[in-house]
């Protein structure tokens, strides 16, 4: 047994230190980024935010809505091949450029992935997603995916430490997904005692990835636009959002009424709700590591995305970053014991 003494930080532990700026308006900030990926040597340009590959977030409807903002969606893995075929037939190539095809690591998952990617060459992104990215089996699976799809961009995770980021990049991942337990409907940290504060995970994993020419996506833990900006400031190339994009018109799931108000259900992908829906129940050797919540219906996602992008632009003006790419270079975090004045409660 050993203990690491240095303190690890989450988004709530810091604020940006403001700095002199030559920017006169938020409209001058460029949020688009262009990335060149290590293994494929191909490029992608867009706003580097990704809707999470969850049943009630990463939907086809969400992909259509977010693509208009040049924002990416990781489509959840539970759509059938027929549903994918219909979506591809009714979608333009530019829309498909903002979609990731998600997969698990079973043989059936791999065969399904092959058939989906064969539907269109515009499907360039693969998201290989497991809760625990530390197994040898996972790294071996990433190698197989890389060998099979040499021209596709692979995003793989989840991990939270530099050495495993390096392992996955060397195994064939272009982008590594970072985060264990920070999500709003994730209970892994409570159920298992395992995790890593998200901001420190991003800072450490970004350093490891960038040294090898890879990228990371900070997955989870964001509760407001300021957290998204902090993830970028900490070095995340992409930021993945679940709860912040849940309960919208495009989120999937059923709306229901209570006391004259409209709600939608949102649940973690390791929750009992998800396992009952997709695996027929919780296996005897498993425990639920997610929760199910009922959220007030928020309407179309466009207003939420505009609020997030506006917040990040404002962050950039406060620290003097004319481009999102510059934000991490302009970032100085200060440790704090408070984030906001709570006298009137949450907004």
Swiss-Prot record:
The keyword Oxidoreductase applies. NADP(+) binds at residues 108-131, 216-239. The active site is at 186 (thioimidate intermediate). Its EC number is 1.7.1.7. One of its GO terms (cellular component) is cytosol. It comes from the Bacteria. Pfam families: IMPDH (PF00478). InterPro entries: Aldolase_TIM, GMP_reductase, GMPR, IMP_DH/GMP_Rdtase_CS, IMP_DH_GMPRt. This is GMP reductase. It comes from Tolumonas auensis (strain DSM 9187 / NBRC 110442 / TA 4). The gene is guaC.
